[in-house]
């Protein structure tokens, strides 16, 4: 990106996959969701995850590490914010179809079975906890090419 943008060009991104993306009050949802998904995976698909090593996509950087990474590539950060967003079930169901998320969450499992299990587990967790949304922090960053 730094080689593509001319000096003064803007680079903007956001992510909820950073250290700090999960709020303490949402941890129960994540635990229930993953527990239920793993159970569904075993019962309905006869599969289990292969937890040999943490998948690279699951290694979250801190907001400061993202900043350092951007600055190391000849950018000046002009805006860095963390916004809390209330994510409804549709957001979690959508992410349950995203390959990088699936591979990071249920490593070694065929994508279709993993996605199915994640979606069913999400429905069960939302229902059991009587949720309409789960709060999630998003890191927003805007940087200018030096």
Task: List the model feature ranges, each with a label.
Residues 59-63, 115, 119, 136:
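A structural signal for well-ordered alpha-helical scaffolds and beta->alpha junctions
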Residues 57-74:
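Short alpha-helix
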Residues 74-75, 96, 135-146:
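Core SAM-dependent methyltransferase catalytic element
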Residues 13, 130, 136:
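Ligand-binding pocket scaffold of soluble enzyme catalytic domains
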Residues 1-10:
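A short glycine-rich, Lys/Arg-flanked "PGG" loop and its adjoining helix->strand segment in the class I
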Residues 36-58:
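Active-site capping/gating segments
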Residues 79-132:
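C-terminal helical/coil "lid" or tail adjacent to the Rossmann-like core of SAM-dependent
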Residues 10-42:
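Conserved class I S-adenosyl-L-methionine
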